[in-house]
């Protein structure tokens, strides 16, 4: 198990910038607005051959509004989970009441853990002198660092990782987890869905749209299969995306889809499917990811025996050529169909990686050609000789014929639909390639 380092401190002391400095990437959203990192964000890191997990947290606010209190709860959970606590303060704003409160909490309640205290933004000789005042927090060795230029960070990492027991060589996993990106517009219930699955208030949830700004990874096991759930900030219409925070959050959603095997696209049952939902679905399809549509908050819809069938018909008519994507009616609140959603997503992931023998494909081709002969505008006959599957992360099939230019769009769509139906390739993009032979 990799050791977990949690960066904690009051808002706007530079926790996310230090997180990014250590990982050498813009992984957490960094902005001058206090409280921008609202949740816990975990990423793997390595220093001098030693592997670890680094956790960024929302700012610790002893008192505040509902979001601040939720951030406080998440920070306390992070502290309990961590092997090492990195307490960060800001030399430019000086030692504050909140800094002292955090210091007392750590030294009284979590004295059994490895705690390192660092003063950030120490970038000039005068600031180094100012940082000496932080000794009064009670920590014997404050580290003076700058997340912006990297000074002092190497020494801090050396000492933190040297404080841990010698790591055993990391084992290589034979069975990789299935990566599921939970995506959708703001406030459709993505975090509530993840929390209900994990059985803990892992992500900040409130009625305020956009309370989950980062993509957050959570790992769990079901039926001996490991899963990674990637929860993201909801995608908004472009006109509503402000420069800075919302831009990076939308980019995070895009990257989450890029990382996943299956995108769980969630919509609110009360509002139905909208154009923005279709943009998210198309984003996943264009990246050849598996897709499962989740109709959340189904418990809030007045219904009779025909409601679900009528609702599904309306959704599929809106989806057009993507109507092959499976959908489930769920409720994160009542937990209706939550585990069925995970089981279906796993089936889609397996469909996406399925390998079909050439003999089975050509038996299929013979039956398909007997059912529908390809027509052409020129009158010249299109002759498909055989087909095979090409090595790829999703189903890609190669057809060898006399002239690929003769292929009509409707016949291509016929073959695609028949392949998906015959080999039960539910929820996955099927790519067809035609070559002259």
From Swiss-Prot:
SUPFAM superfamilies linked to this entry: P-loop containing nucleoside triphosphate hydrolases
Biological role: GTPase that plays an essential role in the late steps of ribosome biogenesis.
PANTHER family: GTPASE DER (PTHR43834:SF6)
Biological process, per Gene Ontology: ribosome biogenesis
Protein's UniProt keywords contain Transcription regulation: no
GO MF annotations, alphabetized: GTP binding; ribosome binding
Keyword terms: GTP-binding, Nucleotide-binding, Repeat, Ribosome biogenesis
Pfam families documented for this protein: KH_dom-like, MMR_HSR1
Amino-acid positions noted as binding GTP 2 in the UniProt annotation, renumbered to this chain: 184-191, 231-235, 296-299
Family: Belongs to the TRAFAC class TrmE-Era-EngA-EngB-Septin-like GTPase superfamily. EngA (Der) GTPase family.
Gene3D superfamilies named among the record's database cross-references: 3.30.300.20, P-loop containing nucleotide triphosphate hydrolases
Protein's name according to its UniProt entry: GTPase Der
Signal sequence bounds: none
Domain KH-like: 354-437
Positions contributing to GTP 1 binding: 9-16, 56-60, 120-123
The keyword Repeat belongs to this UniProt entry's keyword annotation: yes
Domain spans labelled EngA-type G: 3-168, 178-353
Subunit structure: Associates with the 50S ribosomal subunit.
InterPro entries: G_ENGA (IPR031166), GTP-bd (IPR006073), GTPase_Der (IPR016484), KH_dom-like (IPR032859), KH_dom-like_a/b (IPR015946), P-loop_NTPase (IPR027417), Small_GTP-bd (IPR005225)
Species annotation: Chlorobium phaeobacteroides (strain DSM 266 / SMG 266 / 2430)
């Amino acid at each position: 198990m990799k050791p977990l380092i949690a960066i904690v401190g009051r808002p706007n002391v530079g926790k996310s910038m230090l997180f990014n400095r250590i990982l050498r990437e813009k992984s957490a959203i960094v902005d001058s607005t206090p409280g921008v990192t609202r949740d816990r964000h975990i990423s793997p890191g390595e220093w001098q051959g030693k592997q670890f997990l680094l956790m960024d947290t929302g700012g610790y606010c002893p008192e505040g509004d509902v979001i601040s209190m939720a951030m406080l709860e998440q920070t306390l959970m992070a502290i309990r989970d961590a092997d090492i606590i990195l307490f960060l303060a800001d030399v430019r704003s000086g030692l504050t009441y909140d800094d002292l409160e955090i210091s007392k909490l750590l030294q009284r309640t979590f004295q059994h853990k490895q705690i390192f205290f660092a003063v950030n933004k120490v970038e000039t000789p005068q600031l180094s002198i100012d940082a000496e005042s932080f000794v009064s927090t009670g920590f014997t060795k404050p580290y003076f660092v700058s997340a912006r230029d990297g000074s002092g960070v190497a020494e801090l990492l050396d000492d933190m990782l040297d404080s841990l027991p010698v790591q055993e060589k990391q084992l290589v996993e034979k069975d990789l987890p299935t990566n599921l990106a939970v995506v959708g517009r703001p406030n459709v219930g993505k975090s509530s869905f993840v929390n209900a699955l994990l059985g803990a208030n892992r992500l900040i949830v409130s009625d305020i749209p956009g309370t989950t700004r980062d993509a957050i990874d959570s790992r769990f096991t079901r039926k001996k299969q490991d899963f990674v759930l990637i929860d993201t900030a909801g995608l908004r219409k472009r006109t509503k995306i402000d420069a800075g925070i919302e831009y990076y959050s939308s980019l995070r959603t895009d990257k989450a889809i890029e990382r996943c095997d299956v995108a769980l696209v969630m919509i609110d049952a009360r509002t139905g499917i909208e154009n923005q939902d279709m943009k998210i679905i198309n984003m996943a399809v264009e990246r050849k990811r598996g897709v499962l549509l989740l109709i959340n908050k189904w418990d809030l819809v007045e219904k009779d025996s025909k409601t679900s069938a009528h609702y599904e018909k309306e959704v599929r008519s809106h989806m057009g050529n993507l109507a092959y994507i499976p959908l489930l009616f769920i409720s994160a609140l009542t937990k209706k169909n939550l585990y069925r959603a995970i089981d279906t997503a796993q089936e889609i992931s397996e469909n996406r990686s399925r390998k079909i023998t050439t003999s089975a494909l050509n038996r299929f081709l013979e039956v398909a050609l007997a059912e529908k002969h390809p027509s052409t505008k020129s009158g010249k006959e299109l002759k498909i000789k055989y087909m095979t599957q090409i090595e790829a992360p999703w189903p890609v099939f190669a057809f060898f014929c006399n002239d690929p230019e003769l292929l009509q769009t409707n016949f291509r769509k016929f073959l695609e639909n028949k392949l998906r139906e015959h080999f039960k390739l539910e929820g996955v993009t099927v790519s067809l390639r035609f070559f002259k032979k």
